[in-house]
A protein has these predicted regions:
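Acidic/histidine-rich catalytic neighborhood of metal-dependent amide-processing enzymes
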Residues: 141-148, 152, 236, 258-353
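Active-site-adjacent substrate-binding region
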Residues: 232, 329, 337-458
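Soluble metallo-hydrolase cores and metallopeptidase-like ectodomains found primarily
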Residues: 3-7, 93-126, 180-263, 274-285
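Extracellular/luminal Protease-associated
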Residues: 41, 94-189, 373-377
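C-terminal non-catalytic alpha-helical accessory regions
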Residues: 433, 443-681
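Mature extracellular/periplasmic domains of secretome proteins
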Residues: 128-129, 149-159, 176-181, 314-324, ...
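Second-shell loop/turn segments in exported
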Residues: 7-15, 34-44, 115, 137-143, ...
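Noncatalytic luminal/extracellular "stalk/propeptide" segments of secretory-pathway proteins
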Residues: 2-3, 10, 17-18, 22-25, ...
Length: 681
């Protein structure tokens, strides 16, 4: 790569971290809830903030600054206030957070508030909650998401559910509230309460429970206004620095919707991408590729009653508003929570195809003292936590500053404590400088520096050949075809490297653009062929879901043969989403299964086609839970054998699919290789 170090250093010197910080704080002005904040999808607060960012981009000197209109389900959360009276008659008033659901009281209304533990199906036995508020504790990191107990309460006739974080999120202080995407229907209302207020409420419940009732209960007044409006609109804000040589683009992205104040998530990131662009313009940098700055709306949530209800703004942008970006954007640098050190080691998380290039850049970085004592590393593949996943599956190679690990997520994330108090100036400064340099390193290249071999290697490393032999799947042929594709990928990678090393004055940019479009086409096909999700939204290869199911089924069958029911049931927990069959009633389990398997594709968003198979063990779980020592298990053993046979067929199908995918990828890779020897026609 050829980077003019003088111009790089000049641009770095033009960075103004205080300016970025001030913009991040300025983004807090518009809010849907005057007490708690929130800048939610499709709300007036979000749109006004978008208008402000539009003007900021213009002031920074970006050109072609536009508002791209996108479809979303809008959420307006204005208030949620609860009142109760203690033994002395003093009125206690508390603020609640909310989820993306419908609940309007039109002023204070009286409700009975009942405490039901974790809100599982068993907690409701012989309990009438019709028209009542149900109070529960939840750990969304280690147990289940909010949608399960919320929908369970709704089916039981509860007026609404109120969740308190027992562990997992918002652990920084007992006064912390938490917010997440609901991943459920808007007709099942949900709110959040701080642990401090919960402890006060529980004490009042105990004091008033003079008759020793089994279920703690308290009369409260509640005033709430939260509403989901289907099929609304909002805007993504786009500005450009035009390229001088290439028709392709490099994207800087971050989202501008938020929970609470959202200083880290994601005000600081939006301010940073504008700050980097401003520094390039002040430094007089003339990019070879057009640099696009995009402030995305509706990342936290943007569509009702789907598992894939976040990253809506990014999905609408690249699949609907600007589908032409696919095939022309050579990299997306996405940002989340960039003004805080999430670990003792910093990291860039990227797609497989960019991993070698990013690692080479990261390894050469001189780390500043005092903020990341363990240095910096490269992680891959990308995860579904942020917009970069959506970008990747659209055909745009993406990366993000790694943020998903570390104590911030458990303590501050999506709480009112994500504010300026967690600002770390030296971290923010380092990320401005590092990603400006990385951006210019990518811009210095004629071709995107992708290597398709790493993803192919990963698919084979995840393959269990012993299981292939047990199930009759043709793993040997898959190995052979994948090795052929890897060899072709290695040749192509070297051709790309050599082309990028051509002196700038001798580059054929017309040829580079033609090859780039083909390279990005291969990348998109690789995403289509090789990227799947499990039921916990983890990124996996196509055969891994069934492979893991077969491991668990084998364990379970072994235990049942020995008459050991408890460990057999424990093995079921890792089979697709069957862990929820243990805690919630049938209708809950089926709703959140079928809204993935049977919902229309346009509502599955970035999760469309990423989960293929499902093994439904709900009835088997119910039967085994009722078994007593000495009961026959023959019917249950037979059910497990049938499940094993189904999964064997799925596995063989998945391996056959991967064989065809490897052949197709090899052919596509070879087509691009041929372009290096030919003209651009």
């Amino acid at each position: 790569m050829t980077v003019n170090l003088n111009i790089v250093e000049k641009c770095v010197s033009c960075l103004n971290i205080k300016e970025s910080y001030d913009l991040a704080r300025h983004m807090e002005q518009e809010k849907t809830n005057p007490v708690l904040g929130y800048r939610t999808a499709g709300s007036l607060a979000e749109r006004k903030t978008g208008d402000m960012l539009l003007e900021e981009m213009k002031k920074a000197g970006l050109t072609q600054v536009e508002k791209d209109k996108i479809r979303v389900d809008a959420w307006k959360f204005k208030k949620a206030v609860m009142r109760c009276h203690d033994r002395e008659g003093t009125c206690r008033e508390i603020q609640l957070g909310a989820y993306q659901t419908d609940f309007k009281t039109n002023g204070f209304q009286r409700f009975d508030l009942v405490y039901l533990g974790k809100g599982t199906a068993d907690e409701y036995k012989d309990i009438d909650v019709k028209g009542k508020l149900v109070l529960i504790e939840i750990n969304q990191r280690e147990e289940w998401w909010i949608n399960y107990p919320v929908y369970q309460a709704h089916l039981k006739g509860a007026a609404a559910l109120i969740a308190v974080q027992s562990r997992g999120y918002a652990q920084i202080d007992d006064t912390a509230l938490n917010a997440q995407d609901i991943a459920g229907p808007s007709c099942a209302p949900a709110f959040s309460m701080s642990r401090a207020d919960f402890l006060m409420i529980r004490q009042l419940m105990e004091e008033k429970n003079e008759n020793g009732n089994r279920v703690p209960e308290l009369s409260v007044e509640f005033d709430a206004d939260t509403e989901v409006l289907k099929d609304q609109y909002t805007y993504n804000i786009v500005g450009k620095i035009p390229g001088t040589d290439s028709d392709s683009m490099i994207l800087l992205s971050a989202h501008y919707d938020s929970y609470f104040e959202g200083f880290q998530d994601d005000n600081a990131a939006v301010a940073m991408i504008i700050g980097i662009a401003r520094a390039l313009l002040r430094g007089g940098y003339k990019p070879r590729h057009t640099i696009v700055v995009c402030a995305l709306a509706a990342e936290e949530w943007g569509i009702s009653d789907t598992k894939y209800d976040w990253s809506t703004g990014a999905y609408r942008q690249v699949f609907e508003a600007r589908p032409e970006w696919s095939g022309h954007v050579i990299a997306d640098l996405n940002f989340e929570l960039p003004a805080h050190a999430h670990s003792t080691r910093d990291a860039v998380r990227c797609t497989y195809e960019y991993a070698d290039f990013v690692r080479g850049f990261v390894d050469a970085v001189q780390m500043p003292k005092g903020i990341y004592p363990e240095g910096m590393t490269t992680l891959y593949p990308i995860e579904t936590w942020s917009d970069d996943f959506t970008m990747a599956i659209s055909g745009i190679p993406s990366m993000v500053n790694d943020f998903s690990g570390g104590p911030f997520m458990e303590n501050y994330y999506h709480s009112q404590y994500d504010n300026q108090d967690v600002y770390e100036e030296e971290v923010y400064k380092f990320h401005h400088e590092f990603y400006l340099r990385l951006l210019l390193a990518i811009d210095s290249l004629a071709l995107p520096p992708m290597d398709f071999g790493r993803a192919l290697a990963g698919s084979i490393e995840s393959l269990d050949l012993d299981l292939c032999m047990q199930t009759g799947a043709n793993g040997v042929l898959l190995l052979e075809k994948t090795e052929e594709a890897k060899k072709a990928a290695a040749i192509l990678s070297e051709q790309v490297r050599r082309f990028n090393s051509i002196p700038e004055e001798k580059r054929d940019w017309k040829k580079a653009d033609a090859i780039t479009e083909k390279l990005l086409g291969v990348f998109r096909k690789s995403q289509d062929y090789l990227v799947r999700l499990d039921w916990d939204d983890n990124v996996i290869f196509p055969q891994q879901a069934v492979q893991n199911n077969l491991y668990a089924l084998k364990k379970a069958m072994g235990y049942l043969e020995k008459g050991e029911i408890a460990p057999a049931l424990e093995a079921f927990y890792s089979i697709d989403n069957n862990c929820y069959a243990f805690q919630f009633e049938r209708e809950v389990f089926y709703h959140f299964t079928e809204y993935i398997l049977k919902q229309s594709p346009d509502r599955l968003m970035w999760g469309k086609g990423r989960i293929i198979h499902h093994e439904n063990l709900y009835d088997l779980v119910e039967r085994l839970k009722e078994k007593k020592p000495g009961d026959s298990l023959e019917a249950e053993k037979q059910s497990l054998k049938e499940a094993w046979e189904r999964q064997k067929r799925y596995y063989a199908d998945d391996i056959e699919y991967l064989i065809r995918a490897a052949e197709k990828l090899r052919n596509l890779i070879c087509e691009v290789s041929d372009m290096f020897e030919k003209g651009t026609e």
